[in-house]
A protein has these predicted regions:
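Short, solvent-exposed turn/loop segments enriched in Gly/Ser/Thr/Pro and often Arg
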Residues: 9, 35, 192, 239-240
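Short polybasic/polar patches that bind polyanions
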Residues: 23, 205, 228
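GST-like fold's C-terminal all-alpha helical module
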Residues: 108-224
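Long, positively charged, glycine-interspersed low-complexity recognition regions
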Residues: 213-258
Length: 258
C-alpha cells in the first residue's frame, strides 16, 4: 500500500482542497476516484474508512483521516516542508482557523445549491421518487440537503439565499485581502484558508458566477495568483470542472459569454 491513498471525486470541491495540499507538498499519493452517483461512497468497504459516506478520505500508512479541513491541517502538521501552510503564531493560527470555519459554514454549502441545480439535477430527475428518497436517506451528511432540493431542484428563494451568501463571502474575502495587504488571505504567505476557499471561487467561475468579483480586484488578483501556483494544474486535471463533465453546462456558459 502507498504511504498516502486518497479516496476522492474529481469534481468534489472538498476533494480538490486536499489534492491541492498534497500537490503543494510534493507528496506522492495514489488516487482512488469514486463515482458518487454510482454510490461508491456508500459501499461497506468505504464506509469502514469514512462512516460519513462522503469524500474525501485520506489513508496514511493504513490509518484513515477524514474531513477535508482536518486532512489539510493533518498534512501540514506531518509535512511542514517545503513551506508551512499555517501561520507561525498562535494568534495567526486562530485567525486562520476562524476564517476556515466561516468558509465551511457559509460559501462551501452555499455553492452546492447552484451546482446541484445547474449540473446534477438531471441525474436526480431520472430517478423515481422512491429511488431519490432512498438515496437521500443513505447519505448521513447530505440527507436534509437532498430532501430540501427534491427532484425538481431548489426553489427560487433557496437559490437567491445561496447566491446572497456567496456574494457576502466574496465581499468579505476582498476586504480580508485588503486588510492583510495580500496577495493572500493571511497576507504574504499562502495558507490553508486560501486553499479552503479556492474550490468555491473556481466553481463559481466554472458555473458562470464570476461576475461576483467584477468589482472586487483583490479577489480577481487572488484567483490569478492561485491559478499560477504549481499545485493548481495537477489538482484540476481534466474532468475536475463541471463544464468539462457536463456538456450542457459548457454550452450554457458559452451562450452567456456570447
Amino acid at each position: 500500500m502507498p504511504e498516502f491513498l486518497l479516496y476522492n471525486a474529481p469534481q468534489s470541491t472538498c476533494s480538490q482542497r486536499v489534492r491541492f495540499v498534497l500537490n503543494a507538498k510534493g507528496l506522492a499519493f495514489e488516487e482512488v476516484k469514486l463515482d458518487l452517483f454510482a454510490g461508491d461512497q456508500l459501499r461497506p468497504d468505504y464506509l469502514k474508512i469514512n462512516p460519513n459516506g462522503v469524500v474525501p478520505a485520506l489513508v496514511h500508512d493504513g490509518e484513515p483521516v477524514i474531513d477535508s479541513a482536518v486532512i489539510m491541517e493533518y498534512l501540514d502538521e506531518i509535512r511542514p516542508e517545503p513551506e508551512s501552510l499555517r501561520p507561525k503564531t498562535p494568534l495567526g493560527l486562530a485567525r486562520m482557523r476562524s476564517l476556515m470555519r466561516f468558509i465551511d459554514e457559509v460559501p462551501t454549502p452555499a455553492v452546492r445549491v447552484p451546482s446541484y441545480n445547474l449540473a446534477f439535477l438531471p441525474h436526480f430527475q431520472a430517478m423515481s421518487e422512491d429511488e431519490f428518497v432512498a438515496l437521500a436517506n443513505s447519505k448521513p451528511l447530505r440527507r436534509e440537503f437532498l430532501l430540501s432540493m427534491g427532484r425538481s431542484g431548489f426553489p427560487e428563494p433557496d437559490m437567491k439565499s445561496a447566491l446572497d451568501r456567496l456574494a457576502r463571502a466574496v465581499k468579505r474575502m476582498d476586504e480580508i485581502i485588503a486588510a492583510s495587504g495580500g496577495p493572500w488571505l493571511m497576507g504574504e504567505s499562502l495558507s490553508l484558508a486560501d486553499i479552503a476557499i479556492m474550490p468555491v471561487i473556481v466553481r463559481m467561475e466554472d458555473i458562470d458566477l464570476g461576475a461576483a468579483w467584477d468589482d472586487k480586484p483583490n479577489v480577481a488578483r487572488w484567483l490569478s495568483a492561485i491559478r499560477a501556483h504549481p499545485a493548481f494544474r495537477p489538482t484540476y486535471y481534466f474532468g475536475s470542472l463541471l463544464t468539462e463533465k457536463y456538456p450542457h453546462l459548457a454550452e450554457r456558459k458559452s451562450k452567456q459569454a456570447g
